[in-house]
């Protein structure tokens, strides 16, 4: 493209300080360096992780910053040494990466790349420790290596998954984070057998994706557990067959589920990060074969307490990161699940706003309205 090797001026939504509305600014985006790519973002969506670090209540604040990590775009130019993608390729940016060289990437059992694993504090590129964004010569910091709330962004090549160009980016953009996390927790980690019973704790976007994964796997009963009963009707679209609101019962949720399922569920997936829900999700699975999968991220001081007999009675506890998907290797296949109509993505997308109204997406999430809001970069 004519812009290759040059600085691009474009619009970006800049967070100048914690918790304050984003401001649409003209930023300068430097060309990609070695092993980097510059991507024209066409669609992005807001994930709770963006909001969490924008609020910056419990972690190191890094500002001014460009948030955003769930998106779809097209490669504009590539830096030295990049051979896997070329200008014009359709890609999904990913908050974690796959260098393909480290022990994790070479292992069939892990997706936790040593080089490109998620880092929420670093606001610069790993190659030279500098930001590719600036306003009047002053750096604007990156977020989890993606920063998709900008018309153009620069990423390490290991953090972009090349996908089928026929796939509609305004739909599959949501597969680059939360939906794949929940989906993979079910199909890659919990692996519910056909006809099994699965409990899903937390019916936000990730939990609904976990329910969708259980549905695809062939589970016959999918029990949604949530303190907010207004989520129940919507969750039926994702395969949930029945529901438990812990507030409606005067005994622990794990006992309620055991009563409903003749001793416990076959699989559970915990998507809230609440430590009590994590313990309940483990203790509600059936002895002998039950598997519980933890997805939600707990408070840093949380402690997981359960009796060792729960393990000795042959219950299994697993954790997962990004649904155990390797970003570059596996995401193209997740997109193909959608293209083959096996995975229904549209039902996750409840709202859409132009880039100029990006703060509306934050308002919707604050009110708990909808599941995913697509932000259209071109009005």
From Swiss-Prot:
CDD domains: alcohol_DH_plants. GO terms for molecular function: alcohol dehydrogenase (NAD+) activity; S-(hydroxymethyl)glutathione dehydrogenase [NAD(P)+] activity; zinc ion binding. Zn(2+) 2 binds at residues 99, 102, 105, 113. InterPro entries: ADH-like_C, ADH-like_N, ADH_Zn_CS, GroES-like_sf, NAD(P)-bd_dom_sf. Its cofactor is Zn(2+). It is found in: Cytoplasm. Its main location: cytoplasm. Its EC number is 1.1.1.1. PROSITE patterns: ADH_ZINC. Belongs to the zinc-containing alcohol dehydrogenase family. This is Alcohol dehydrogenase 1. It comes from Cenchrus americanus.
């Amino acid at each position: 493209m004519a812009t290759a090797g040059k600085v691009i001026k474009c619009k970006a939504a800049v967070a100048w300080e914690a918790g304050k509305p984003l401001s649409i600014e003209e930023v300068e985006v430097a060309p990609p360096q070695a092993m980097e790519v510059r991507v024209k973002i066409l669609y992005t969506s807001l994930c709770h992780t963006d909001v969490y670090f924008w609020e910056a209540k419990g972690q190191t604040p890094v500002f001014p910053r460009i948030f955003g990590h769930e998106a779809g775009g097209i490669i504009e130019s590539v830096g030295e040494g990049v051979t896997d993608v070329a200008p014009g390729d359709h890609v999904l940016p990913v908050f974690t990466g796959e260098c393909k060289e480290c022990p994790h990437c070479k292992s069939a059992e892990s997706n936790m790349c040593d080089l490109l694993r998620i880092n929420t504090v670093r606001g610069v590129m790993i190659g030279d420790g500098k930001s590719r964004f600036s306003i009047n010569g002053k750096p604007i910091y990156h977020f989890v290596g993606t920063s998709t709330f900008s018309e153009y962004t620069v990423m390490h090549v290991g953090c972009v998954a090349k996908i089928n160009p026929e796939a509609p980016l305004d739909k599959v953009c949501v597969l680059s984070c939360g939906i794949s996390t929940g989906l993979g927790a079910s199909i890659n980690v919990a692996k519910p057998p056909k006809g099994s019973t699965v409990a899903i704790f937390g019916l936000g976007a990730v939990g609904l994706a976990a329910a969708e994964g259980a549905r695809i796997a062939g589970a016959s009963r999918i029990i949604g557990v949530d303190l907010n009963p207004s989520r129940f009707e919507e969750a039926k679209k994702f395969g949930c067959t029945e529901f438990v609101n812990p507030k409606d019962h005067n005994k622990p949720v794990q006992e309620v589920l055991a009563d409903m399922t003749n001793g416990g569920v076959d699989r559970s997936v915990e998507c809230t990060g609440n430590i009590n829900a994590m313990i309940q999700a483990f203790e509600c699975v059936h002895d002998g074969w039950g598997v519980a999968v933890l997805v939600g991220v707990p408070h840093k001081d949380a402690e997981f307490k359960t009796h060792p007999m729960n393990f000795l009675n042959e219950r299994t506890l697993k954790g997962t990161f990004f649904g155990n998907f390797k970003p570059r290797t596996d995401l193209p296949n997740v997109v193909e699940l959608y293209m083959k109509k096996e995975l229904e993505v549209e039902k996750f997308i409840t709202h859409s706003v132009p880039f100029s109204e990006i703060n509306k997406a934050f308002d919707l999430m604050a009110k708990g309205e909808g599941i995913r809001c697509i932000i259209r970069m071109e009005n």
